[in-house]
Amino acid sequence: MILQISPGSSWLIRGAAALILSLHITSAGVGILSGSLALLARKGSQLHRKAGNWFFVSMLTMSAIGAAVAPFLPDRISTVAAVLTFYLVATAWVTVRRNDGGAGPFGIGAAIVGVCIAVAGMMFGLQAANSATGVIEGQPAGAAFMFATVATLAAIGDLSTIVRRGVVGERRIARHLWRMCFALFIAAGSFFLGQQQVFPTFLRGSTLLFLPEIAVLGLMIFWLVRVRFTKWLERRAQHPDQSAREP
């Protein structure tokens, strides 16, 4: 994210812009590091919880700043990405923090937000696809369609939680897992692919910069399969001493 400030702006505006940009970059870095640590740590451990807390705060900070600033750049698709990230992290957090897993008024509000994100992403994606260059404001149509698809799936999950009056067991863990992981995927992509100018010249445009995003998606799929299609959660409940030695 680059803030364009007029050379004639007052020192107060320049200072505020520098502070906002520094906070955005710092929170993004903390989010990527803490999210990676939470993903690799033993699930349910103190390290996992502490890293998750840092991830929650830093990602909400980063995405809130992005959502507030991106419309003025202007960068509509990045605005969608920022709001989606905030939404995914917030709903994932509530899923494991509340007994109802996010049903009730919060779930209704979350579903509405998810639908709005999906509609906005689809609309901007169509605008980009129908443009002469296939992009709008430097962002490709495919990115907008991807965000719209993820928001649609998340909104469907919210509606399912409302209908079921909560989410428990494997569904609850899976809901928390994929939302946090995809938020981390967005953050990693924004940094490693969207800010290539901060890397050495030989790395710019390199496929190596795709590895962090691939790793996040790979670990997300691994854990989703392990949670939903094996008895991992049941074994952890039955043998807590043994599970303490497992990831």
Where are these regions (language model features)?
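Alpha-helical membrane insertion/targeting regions
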Residues: M1-P247
